[in-house]
């Protein structure tokens, strides 16, 4: 099965995804981003977009990764419900990418003015794997969201965690002011 079905499907999915990834990267770089995100979602140049890849190749790594890309593209084009749906379908053992996906779900909920759900996902992102890149980033978002919810004690806990355990990160540079707000 692996050799005759799964491996060829994976290769085919990766080939289909190349143009969509190029469009996504150009959109991320800020070049006519909305239309490029749409091309990355729906396809162009005779190649599938992330939506079709996620559907047609759902059992492959490329199909799974297409869920992530589709979610981020939807997030960046203001379609937050769709972003949440696709990001929730994405599964990853990659410590950074998995956390970024959970954090992006938090961002989508934040944009939908659902701060409790945003906070829940920021905490999942921060705790999914402790590291100097994603953990302080999402602890900071969790703290700001907790402040928005009026939960100063939790916000203080998140900000203090950044100050004490991630002092060399960019997030630590602004955390003293936020600690003052949370006290």
Regions found by a protein language model. Name each.
Residues 7, 55-63, 77, 91-99, ...:
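Short solvent-exposed coil/turn linkers within tandem alpha-helical repeat scaffolds
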Residues 30-82:
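Extracytoplasmic/periplasmic/luminal assembly and interaction segments
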């Amino acid at each position: 099965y692996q050799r005759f079905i799964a491996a060829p499907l994976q290769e085919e999915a990766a080939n289909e995804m190349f143009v969509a990834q190029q469009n996504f990267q150009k959109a991320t770089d800020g070049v006519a981003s909305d239309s490029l995100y749409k091309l990355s979602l729906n396809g162009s140049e005779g190649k599938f977009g992330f939506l079709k890849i996620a559907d047609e190749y759902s059992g492959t790594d490329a199909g799974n990764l297409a869920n992530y890309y589709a979610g981020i593209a939807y997030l960046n084009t203001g379609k937050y419900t769709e972003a949440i749906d696709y990001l929730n379908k994405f599964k990853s053992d990659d410590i950074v990418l998995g956390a970024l996906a959970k954090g992006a779900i938090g961002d989508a909920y934040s944009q939908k003015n659902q701060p409790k759900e945003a906070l829940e996902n920021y905490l999942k992102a921060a705790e999914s794997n402790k590291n100097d890149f994603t953990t302080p980033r999402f602890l900071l978002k969790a703290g700001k969201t907790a402040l928005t919810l009026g939960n100063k004690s939790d916000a203080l806990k998140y900000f203090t965690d950044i100050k004490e355990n991630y002092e060399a990160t960019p997030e630590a540079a602004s955390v003293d002011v936020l600690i003052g707000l949370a006290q």
